[in-house]
Amino acid sequence: MDRQAQFRAREALIFDVAERLLLESGEMGMTLDTLALELDLAKGTLYKHFQSKDELYLLLIIRNEQALLDMVRDNQGDFPARLVFYMLHHLHHPERTVLFHQIEERLSAGAQGLGVLFSQLYRIRKQRLRLIIGITDNYLKAQQCSMSVRDYLAAIWSMTQGAASMLNSSFYQRYLGSRDTFRVAVIDQMLALPQQFKQPTNPAA
C-alpha cells in the first residue's frame, strides 16, 4: 500500500472512530485526547488530517452528506424506494441526525476558518438536491399531484427531522412503543402525502 493509500485508510479509520465516540459521548464529551488514545495514535498525527475539533465535526458531516449523494447516484430504484432509503438512513441513526444538525447550525453561526469546508458541504448538498428535484418532479407528475416539489421535499425533511428528534428523545421515546412500527408509520405518511393533493380529473364531455 502506497503512502497516499495508507493516509486515506488511516483517515477513514479516524473518522469512523471519531463518529462513534461523538455519538457515544456527545459533542462536549468527545475530546481529541480520547480519540488519539482510542486509535493509539499521537495527537500530532490527528492534526495531519484536521486542524481542530470543529473541523473534524464538519468533515464528519461532509462525509455523511457525501454518503447521501452517493446513494442517490447509485440507487436505481423508483422514487418510493429512494424515499425509504433516505428516511431510514436518518431514522435508524436518530442520534447522528439530531447531533449533526445541531453541530452544523452551531458552526455555521460562529465558527471561524471553516468557509472552505462549508462551501464543500453546500456543493455536495446542492448536487444531491439537483438530482432529487428532477426525480421528485417526475414522480409527482406521474401521481397527478398538485403539490409542488419544494413543498413535498420540505415535508419529507421536516417529518424526518421531527421523527429523528422523537426517536432520540429520552422523554418521547417512552411513549412511542415499537420504534420499528413508528418508522414505518412515518414513512407511510410521506408516501401517502401526494394522494392528498391529487389533481381533479376533468369529467368526460
Q: Where in this protein do the model-derived segments appear?
A:
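Amphipathic alpha-helical packing segments from all-alpha helical-bundle domains
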Residues: 69, 73, 112-142, 150-154, ...
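Hydrophobic alpha-helical connector segments
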Residues: 59, 70-96, 149-156
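N-terminal intrinsically disordered/low-complexity leader segments
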Residues: 1-9, 143, 198-205
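Alpha-helical DNA-contacting segments of helix-turn-helix folds
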Residues: 56-64
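Amphipathic alpha-helical segments used for helix-helix packing
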Residues: 92-119, 165-172
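Short hydrophobic/aromatic patch on the recognition helix
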Residues: 39-50
